[in-house]
Structures are given as C-alpha cells and as structure tokens.
C-alpha cells in the first residue's frame, strides 16, 4: 500500500508526505 499524502506508519517509522495532495 502506498499512501502519498498525510502521515502514516510505514512499518518502522511515521512518514509524512504532501507529494500528491
């Protein structure tokens, strides 16, 4: 699952992205 907008857990850390909002 790829989530490209917002904050989510990628398995080892929180990732925050605004790359395709």
Swiss-Prot record:
**Domain of life (superkingdom):** Eukaryota
Q: In which tissues is it expressed?
A: Expressed by the salivary gland. This peptide is considered as a venom peptide.
One GO molecular-function entry: toxin activity
Question: Which cysteines form disulfides?
Answer: 4-20, 5-21, 7-16
The alphabetical list of record keywords is: Acetylcholine receptor inhibiting toxin, Disulfide bond, Neurotoxin, Postsynaptic neurotoxin, Secreted, Toxin
Compartments annotated for it: namely:
Secreted
* Keyword Signal (UniProt): no
GO cellular component labels: extracellular region; host cell postsynaptic membrane
Main location (coarse class): secreted
Q: What does this protein do?
A: Injections of 20 uM of this synthetic peptide (Ile) causes partial paralysis to polychaete worms (Nereis virens), the natural prey of terebrid snails. This paralysis may be due to an inhibition of nicotinic receptors at the neuromuscular junction.
The record comments on the domains as follows:
The cysteine framework is III (CC-C-C-CC). This peptide has a cysteine scaffold similar to the M superfamily of conotoxins, but it displays a disulfide pattern previously unknown in native cone snail peptides.
Name used for this protein in its record? Venom peptide Tv1
Organism of this sequence: Terebra variegata (Variegate auger snail)
């Amino acid at each position: 699952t790829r989530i490209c907008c917002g904050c989510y857990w990628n398995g080892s850390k929180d990732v925050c992205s605004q790359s395709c909002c």
